Amino acid sequence: MAVLPKRNADRTEHSSLPIAQLILLTAAVLAVSAGSVSPTLSWNIIGLATATILTGLLITTENRARHRLLPAGAFRITTALGALYATMSLLAVAVTSGEIFVPLFLQVLHHQSPLVAGYLAALMAAGWTLGSIASSGVSGKGIKCAILAGPILGAAGMVALTVLMRTESDGGWMSLTPICIGLIAIGLGVGLAWPHLLTRVFQVASAGEQDLAAASITTVQLFATALGAALAGMVANVAGLSDPGGIAGTSSAAAWLFGVFALAPIIGVFTALRVVRFHSKNGESHKASRNRSRSDITS
């Protein structure tokens, strides 16, 4: 005689798709994308304003919805989960914003062939892989250092590219090497922090929301990537990539793009500090619980 396990009520409740939130999320990205196509500043502002309103509606709908898109507390920076999602999003935005236009900048400003420019742009991905491998075995204080190193290296790389990428060169290795180091630094930072940020999402999610937390990681990453790409196009367009275009327009676009999006990892330093603080508090509480358990056993 077999006894079937009891059905998990939480899992059943979250089985339906959060259609309203998905529509609002998609519409917010499309609003920024539509605004970025126009070279007119007013249309860019309208696109951003529309995306902001739609994001606000998304948060309101999510807080009231029966079927959630993200775990509880995901939209509040004061919670451990909110700080984690914010840090992940800011790192993803930094990588995406640079990755899209780096091949173009290298071709126009540094006279590289499309093939070479593509390989050099892939240095971000190589740095990400290297960072993930390097930080995979760390524990204790090493985890905190890896999480903080992510946005710090990202900010350093973005600031360096703000200065280096905009200056036209003959494409020699003397001028390309510092740019390559900046690209690697951005990817390396994300790679160092990312595995531990993912682990923390599972650790801080409430007991009935582990499955939702697992699914939400991809949702947050893709949303941040799409939004970062749309915003990058908007900044580059406004900065002169299309008008006046050429060397002058591309140089201006490179300076503005990396300068504006350097703010993402800089803000990420502060959200990463919150992640580390929450991690320390949880560690202390677990240690206190173990000590109480040992005291009860000995008594």
State each model region's role.
Residues 25, 225, 290:
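Alpha-helical and His/Cys-centered functional microenvironments
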Residues 13, 62, 99, 168, ...:
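Glutamate identity and glutamate-enriched acidic tracts
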Residues 6, 141-144, 281, 287:
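Context-gated lysine
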Residues 1-86, 94:
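Hydrophobic transmembrane-helix bundles of small-molecule transporters
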Residues 268-299:
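Actinobacteria-biased recognition of intrinsically disordered, low-complexity terminal regions
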Residues 43, 67-242, 247-279:
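12-transmembrane solute porter fold
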